[in-house]
């Protein structure tokens, strides 16, 4: 387009085309507002050899062929026109100058169509030109918006109206442009084919709020009531902005959670829900809902909504906090310690909210923290009393969990006061009670016999452990008369302790050993002594009867521990010592014992008196160990 002051190109083309041929030049299309007028510029030519005295012309509507009887718009020869054009058409050009410009007034929609010109030079020199002009009757201004309007980028919007009526000139104004910018009327412009337009330009920088805004242009004609308005909706492109989203969400484990993300953009955005870089759901939409069924602690965290289109992107995050009961606590630390060392134990768990952590031992609270996931227990200089079972308990308003753990304190053996020896009848039992960790090895030493017995000799030693206390029992048989000294020694990798075991309740044990049988034996010995004295006295007065003689195997009375008939006393002593060595698990020959024997013949009586006790007939023997 060029300004009005420029040389009309159309007329240059007409002038340059003169060459003596039949031809016409007019705009292929032309527009006019209803109720106004329109001037259709036209030029024609004919061969130079034709020199007509008068040149006539005819304008036809919608057909160039007279035989079709098209409506006559204008006819210079007769001035007879179709009724639709009565008083509406006239020729502005001079046909003698080959100017066929036509003016139509008070145009209406039914006048819209094709217009053809026919030259009449007289006789057979008549020619209907194929070139024609299409008239368009309009009612609205033409608002031209750039194909792409981007928020933040300056744009130019134009309003264009036809200005082909020399009698009425349009005036343009903008409607709904408040806040957009001030319009600039550029003026009247000529188009390439010789038609004219009135143009007004509006420059502004659109915002996202301008999207969908109706911008209007009005064409009015002074001194008339004619007004024409046109509108265009602004299609402003802009990047997404997230306008709707959940705030931080708290949910109980196992419940249903919905997260909503809504964005404003043009065109609509691609919405994506993500967590830790993983796409959970996406769609091209203005809003997107993320459904989480039966949430677990693993779904606790930060969720991101990303909105993007060709013009940019936006993102926002929302935190999901899943509330749940504490997990079973885990315990880390030294579970085995040596007496005197410092022990540090860490109890930890996971929950939401953070729990109350407590460490118990035997229902006694040792340490506790509130709303923390870790608890450190410090035990300086541990002792055996610290050994045992502990509990770490975690709780919040959603539940409670606990974990038990054991602390093992290792220490050197300690011989307890319960250790002792006791005699019962012909048996001696020695108890060695040891507290130790780890379990000790226990040995019993008999110094007087140079004998050591340990736990491996199950025939003599029985051991039983209860917690940190080990009880070892040594059993000696046939030792009640002269119980030996017994020393108990307990040993582990942290040391050794020895103790000579005391005999408890010796006098009570002796009478318990004697018991009813011992009382009978003692009474029999007493009767024998009385009988012996009586018999001795009688010997002085009574002559020995020849019929009384000692038997081959007279009855013999030993102590309560040794009762053997028909065997020498020396053999009995040797047998007993051998038995004792077998009791202690010793090998070898028993040592020789120096035994002295004393035997008394208490005399014989020829007959047995009915009042004489059986013991009166017994011999008395005594064995001494030197």
Swiss-Prot record:
UniProt record, GO biological process: axon regeneration; cell adhesion; cell-cell adhesion via plasma-membrane adhesion molecules; cellular response to mechanical stimulus; central nervous system myelin formation; negative regulation of axon extension; negative regulation of neuron apoptotic process; negative regulation of neuron differentiation
Q: Which parts of the sequence are annotated with region: Disordered?
A: 582-608
Q: Which residues are glycosylated?
A: 99, 106, 223, 246, 315, 406, 450, 454
What GO CC annotations are associated with the protein? compact myelin; membrane raft; mesaxon; myelin sheath; myelin sheath adaxonal region; paranode region of axon; plasma membrane; Schmidt-Lanterman incisure
Stretches assigned to the Ig-like C2-type domain? 139-237, 241-325, 327-412, 413-508
Could you say which residues bind a ganglioside GT1b (d18:1(4E)) here? 65-67, 118, 124-128
Which cellular compartments is it found in?
Cell membrane; Membrane raft
Q: Where are the transmembrane segments?
A: 517-536
Give the similarity note. Answer: Belongs to the immunoglobulin superfamily. SIGLEC (sialic acid binding Ig-like lectin) family.
Q: What clinical condition does the entry mention?
A: Spastic paraplegia 75, autosomal recessive: A form of spastic paraplegia, a neurodegenerative disorder characterized by a slow, gradual, progressive weakness and spasticity of the lower limbs. Rate of progression and the severity of symptoms are quite variable. Initial symptoms may include difficulty with balance, weakness and stiffness in the legs, muscle spasms, and dragging the toes when walking. In some forms of the disorder, bladder symptoms (such as incontinence) may appear, or the weakness and stiffness may spread to other parts of the body.
* The name this protein goes by in its record: Myelin-associated glycoprotein
Q: Which organism is it from?
A: Homo sapiens (Human)
């Amino acid at each position: 387009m060029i300004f009005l002051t420029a040389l009309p190109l159309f007329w240059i083309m007409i002038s340059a085309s003169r060459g003596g041929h039949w031809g016409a030049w007019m705009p292929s299309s032309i527009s006019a507002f209803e109720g106004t007028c329109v001037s259709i510029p036209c030029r024609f030519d004919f061969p130079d050899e034709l020199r007509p005295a008068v040149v006539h012309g005819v304008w036809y509507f919608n057909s160039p062929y007279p035989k079709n009887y098209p409506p006559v718009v204008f006819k210079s020869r007769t001035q007879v026109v179709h009724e639709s054009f009565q008083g509406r058409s006239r020729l502005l050009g001079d046909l003698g100058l080959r100017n066929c410009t036509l003016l139509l007034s008070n145009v209406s929609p039914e006048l819209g169509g094709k217009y053809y010109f026919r030259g009449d030079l007289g006789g057979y020199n008549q020619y209907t030109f194929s070139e024609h002009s299409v008239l368009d009757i309009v009612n609205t201004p033409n608002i031209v918006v750039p194909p792409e309007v981007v928020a933040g980028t300056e744009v130019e919007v134009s309003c264009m109206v036809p200005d082909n009526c020399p009698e009425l000139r349009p005036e343009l104004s903008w409607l709904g442009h408040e806040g957009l910018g001030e319009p600039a009327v550029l003026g009247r412009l000529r188009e390439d084919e010789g038609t004219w337009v009135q143009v007004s330009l509006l420059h502004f920088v659109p915002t996202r709020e301008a999207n969908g805004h109706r911008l209007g242009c009005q064409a009015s004609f002074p001194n008339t009531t004619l007004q024409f308005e046109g509108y265009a909706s602004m299609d402003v492109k802009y990047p997404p902005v997230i306008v709707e989203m959940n705030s931080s969400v708290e949910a109980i484990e196992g419940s249903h959670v919905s997260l909503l993300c809504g964005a404003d953009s043009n065109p609509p955005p691609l919405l994506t829900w993500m967590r830790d870089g993983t796409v959970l759901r996406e769609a091209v939409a203005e809003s997107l809902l993320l459904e989480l069924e039966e949430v677990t602690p693993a779904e606790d965290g930060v969720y991101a909504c990303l909105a993007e289109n060709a013009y940019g992107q936006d993102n926002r995050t929302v935190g999901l906090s899943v509330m749940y009961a504490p997990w079973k606590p885990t315990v880390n630390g030294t579970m085995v310690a040596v007496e005197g060392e410092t022990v540090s134990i860490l109890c930890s768990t996971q929950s939401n909210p953070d729990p109350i952590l407590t460490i118990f031992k035997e229902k006694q609270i040792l340490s506790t923290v509130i709303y923390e996931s870790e608890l450190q227990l410090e035990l300086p200089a541990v002792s055996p009393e610290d050994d045992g079972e502990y509990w770490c308990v975690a709780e919040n308003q959603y539940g409670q969990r606990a974990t038990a753990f054991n602390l093992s304190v290792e220490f050197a053996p300690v011989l307890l006061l319960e250790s002792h020896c006791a005699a019962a009848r012909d048996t001696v039992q020695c108890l060695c009670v040891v507290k130790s960790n780890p379990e000790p090895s226990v040995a019993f030493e008999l110094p007087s016999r140079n004998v050591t017995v340990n736990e491996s000799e199950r025939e003599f030693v029985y051991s039983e452990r209860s917690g940190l206390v080990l009880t070892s029992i040594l059993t000696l048989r046939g030792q009640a008369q002269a119980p030996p000294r017994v020393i108990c020694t307990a040993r582990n990798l942290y040391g050794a302790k020895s103790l000579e075991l005391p005999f408890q309740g010796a006098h009570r044990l002796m009478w318990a050993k004697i018991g009813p049988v011992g009382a009978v034996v003692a009474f029999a010995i007493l009767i024998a002594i009385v009988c012996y004295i009586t018999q001795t006295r009688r010997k002085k007065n009574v002559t020995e009867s020849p019929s009384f003689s000692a038997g081959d195997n007279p009855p013999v009375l030993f102590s309560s521990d040794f009762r053997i008939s028909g065997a020498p006393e020396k053999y009995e002593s040797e047998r007993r010592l051998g038995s004792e060595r077998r009791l202690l698990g010793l090998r070898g020959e028993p040592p020789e014992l120096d035994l002295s024997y004393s035997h008394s013949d208490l005399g014989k009586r020829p007959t047995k008196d009915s009042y004489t006790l059986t013991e009166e007939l017994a011999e008395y023997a005594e064995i001494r160990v030197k």
